[in-house]
Amino acid sequence: MENKYTHGVLFYHEHSGLKNINQGIGEVTTALSSICKHLSIQLSENEGDIIKYCQEIKTKNYAKDVDILFILGGDGTVNELINGVMTHDLQLPIGILPGGTFNDFTKTLNIAPNHKQASEQMISAQVGKYDVIKINNQYALNFVGLGLIVQNAENVQDGSKDIFGKLSYIGSTVKTLLNPTQFNYQLSIDDKTYSGETTMILTANGPFIGGSRIPLTDLSPQDGELNTFIFNEQSFSILNDIFKKRDSMNWNEITQGIEHIPGKKISLTTDPAMKVDIDGEISLETPIDIEVIPNAIQLLTVNDL
């Protein structure tokens, strides 16, 4: 097989979700080395390392011939690479290999959940261009959320149940595991303003959150638009309804308890200030400014058969 790329760099974190990261590295390099003349394997020891390596690749200090990047890890590790590529304007394709708790965006790319299978898919995968979310000075592929979704992420970090990941818990157990905090919000989306009280706001680029598809057939990370959802109902059985419906369901048939607002530029303030979940990483607080950057990143995509 002819090598597609000259020099690929495979990033990984030793605290990846894989039980044996070294074994995982070995399992993916067979396929990756078949499409790269030269494959570098780069450990990220500390948070922020991948962003530094992206800077070195941009300035050619890492190597002069890097023409593709791979990442083995969960959404948090992928998020760091996305930030490195966007911050340093690396016009390079990225191949994502699942290796963590969730890899929501790999579902969008039709990539297998198993890292070894995913690496084999990279051989025939095609490069697609995707929108990126900019949040203040950070970047994300999939979503920005606050309220209940942040409480959920903090529960996961504490080793508790992942409500969004285990949908059977939504509705009944959510009230016992979490006491959703009401907060006031002021939202501006493409110069239209919205305000009120809620327990959760989500802005989505991709169609999957927590492993489940948002039932909007036209939600796409390639349409130059973001989708904001305001959860107006206090009853969280509504979440169960949303995530269990099929794609063919009309949004308005499901519930009147969630407001859906598409848009490109978003400003959000809350009272009190709220923590913000960006693709599973909690690193900001409100107020925040959000915008979509169309066709900003190149990702290896498996053709949907």
UniProtKB/Swiss-Prot annotation:
Coiled coil: none annotated. The active site is at E281. It holds the Pfam family YegS_C. Binds 1 Mg(2+) ion per subunit. This ion appears to have a structural role and is required for catalytic activity. Transmembrane segments: none annotated. One of its GO terms (biological process) is phospholipid biosynthetic process. This is Putative lipid kinase SAS0691. It comes from Staphylococcus aureus (strain MSSA476).
